[in-house]
């Protein structure tokens, strides 16, 4: 084969792996985003906006301290129920399917209803483990020469359940990592990276990038060792999912708030955050049983042929809110602009000048904008 022929094949292969990203031009970051070079996303569990940010909130650090330092997105929505479909959306732009809506109790391959990704960047079908042609934000960052890590609290704490790195249930088995034990409260349904072949098929890559939360402190010690994108998942007690927790702690928002009190100051004091960081704290979905539980925004629709809408009994995952803290955000900012998890992905992609994956590229969907960020220089940090 000639050198030219090999080059053509290499380009074709790269485009196939890039999948969704290949037909979506990268957006040039707006002025309020191109100052940010380190993003930290912390995802908590199962609370509505009213529970978290209402007058009787049991989470004063999140609802008062952090909002006074940053921005509160009052109309930020989840995109479905239960957990896994929301986590998948945050890093891939893929919508809910009937298996991710149920948190994939049986881990199966994704079965496409058609082999190609559609014009909206979706791979239609059902299943848990997405094929290699479904790209993630992690894949995009690597191709751009940028760094990422997923930090999972408790992962590998009980070595008989899962590894300390890249811990996940095996294909075609019942997932035993969906609930907490006294020795280990890690849940792989809250770790979106392990549901993509593009990540788990390279064991060394997955082990290096999907790690226990204990690694975060050392990584934050210098700008050079801090990933450009960090995705932080507490365990099933400290993310608020369980209440009470298996070890007797209260769980819910009380334990979530304590997790933030413990970890957010460490990030705030890190060189990377102080230079050019953005912290996003949000929830996967609203809690059950409320009128707003399945509310949606941003023209979200179900996948064609879906048996259920994204929220099972409604169009979305409920109004949950989000708090953003950054040297480039004025404390006490509040925005009523509608956003959702696809907006979060779109924002991260715009920050790093990446194409929009899946429904992050939906027409009319907005990245976090000037309603949130100020045009500030690094010398104006607070």
Where are these predicted regions, by residue range?
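Bacterial N-terminal signal peptides
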Residues: 8-19
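Residue-level detector of intrinsically disordered/flexible regions characterized by low predicted structural confidence
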Residues: 6-8, 25
């Amino acid at each position: 084969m000639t050198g030219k022929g090999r080059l053509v094949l290499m380009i074709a292969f790269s485009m196939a792996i890039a999948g969704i990203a290949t037909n979506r031009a990268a957006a040039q970051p707006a002025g309020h985003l191109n100052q940010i070079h380190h993003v930290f996303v912390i995802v908590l569990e199962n609370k509505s906006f009213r529970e978290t940010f209402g007058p009787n909130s049991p989470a004063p650090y999140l609802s008062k301290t952090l909002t006074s330092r940053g921005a509160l997105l009052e109309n930020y929505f989840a995109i479905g129920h239960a957990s896994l479909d929301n986590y998948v959306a945050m890093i891939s732009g893929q919508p809910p399917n009937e298996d991710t809506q149920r948190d994939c109790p049986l881990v199966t391959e994704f079965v496409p209803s058609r082999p190609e990704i559609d014009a909206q960047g979706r791979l239609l079908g059902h299943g848990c483990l997405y094929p290699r042609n479904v790209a993630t934000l992690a894949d995009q960052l690597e191709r751009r020469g940028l760094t990422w890590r997923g930090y999972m609290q408790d992962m590998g704490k009980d070595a008989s359940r899962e590894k300390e790195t890249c811990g996940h249930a095996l294909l075609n088995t019942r997932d035993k990592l969906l609930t907490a034990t006294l020795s280990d409260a890690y849940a792989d349904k809250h770790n979106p990276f392990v549901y993509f072949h593009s990540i788990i098929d390279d064991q060394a890559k997955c082990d290096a990038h999907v790690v226990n939360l204990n690694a975060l402190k050392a990584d934050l010690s210098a700008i050079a060792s801090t990933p450009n994108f960090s995705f932080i998942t507490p365990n099933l007690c400290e993310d608020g999912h369980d209440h009470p927790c298996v070890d007797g702690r209260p769980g819910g928002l009380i334990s979530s708030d304590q997790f933030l009190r413990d970890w957010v100051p460490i990030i705030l004091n890190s060189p990377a955050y102080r230079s050019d960081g953005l912290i996003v704290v949000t929830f996967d979905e609203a809690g059950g049983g409320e009128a707003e539980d399945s509310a949606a925004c941003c023209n979200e629709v179900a996948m064609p042929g879906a048996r259920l809408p994204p929220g099972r009994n409604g169009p979305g995952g409920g109004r949950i809110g989000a708090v953003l803290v950054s040297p480039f955000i004025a404390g006490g900012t509040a925005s009523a602009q509608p956003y959702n998890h696809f907006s979060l992905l779109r924002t991260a992609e715009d920050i790093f000048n990446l194409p929009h994956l899946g429904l992050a590229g939906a027409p009319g969907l907005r990245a976090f904008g000037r309603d949130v960020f100020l045009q500030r220089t690094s010398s104006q940090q607070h």
